[in-house]
Regions:
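Conserved polymerase palm-domain catalytic core
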Residues: 1-38, 96, 155-159
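Short, hydrophobic/aliphatic alpha-helical segments
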Residues: 6-14, 84-85, 118-121
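C-terminal reverse transcriptase regions that engage the nucleic-acid substrate
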Residues: 26, 34, 45, 50, ...
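Histidine-centered active-site/metal-ligand motif
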Residues: 63-67
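Short small-residue beta-strand/loop micro-motif enriched in glycine and branched aliphatics
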Residues: 15-19, 57, 115-116
């Protein structure tokens, strides 16, 4: 392996990580590449993978058992292991990466929707970026997202002073309402 790349020395000796440590700038990309390579035969056929979140989807229970077995075998071949307490097997409704996925369709996770109700009015450019970043993640559910966000987007233009006005308040309020009223 590549463990030598993480080596460091202290007065207590020479050390190398045996597992992927948190904090390395390329760790997420490297791990995603590993997961993609490991599960490549199944990607977009019956598997979606994002870092350590794996979604296995099937049309019936028998097919699902086969899919789960294939994925677990591939992970085992790559010396990757799952924690059973973090797994959900044979469910028809799952919360995955902030979305609720079920046979009837995809929706936003209710806890994400409820968090928007208490979101404070942005007081800086960074606050606007954080709010719009959150909203942008769910933009597929928000009709005319660009139009609704335009009031706040105006403040993100270069050399524009941060002055919160009626356009920005209307933009902020209408986006929050889209999440809360269920019109997403």
């Amino acid at each position: 392996g590549e463990e030598w790349k993480t080596a460091f020395r202290t007065r207590y000796g020479h050390f190398e990580y045996c597992v992927m440590p948190f904090g390395l700038s390329n760790a997420p990309a490297s791990f995603q590449a590993l997961m993609n390579d490991t599960l490549r035969p199944f990607l977009d056929i019956f598997v979606v993978v994002y870092l350590d979140d794996i979604l296995i989807y099937s049309t019936n229970e028998l097919e699902h058992r086969t899919h789960v077995t294939k994925v677990l075998e591939k992970l085992s071949e790559a010396n990757l292991f799952v924690k059973l307490e973090k797994c959900e097997f044979h469910v028809s409704k799952v919360d995955f990466l902030g979305y609720v996925i079920e046979p009837s369709g995809i929706s936003m996770s209710p806890d994400k929707v409820s968090s928007i109700t208490t979101w404070p009015r942005p007081a800086s450019i960074k606050d606007i970026q954080a709010f719009l970043g959150f909203c942008n993640y769910y933009r597929i559910f928000i009709e005319e997202y660009s139009k609704l966000a335009s009031g706040m987007l105006k403040l993100l233009k270069k050399d524009t002073p941060f002055i919160w006005g009626t356009d920005q308040e209307a933009s902020f309020t209408s986006l929050k309402e889209q999440f809360v009223t269920g019109k997403v």
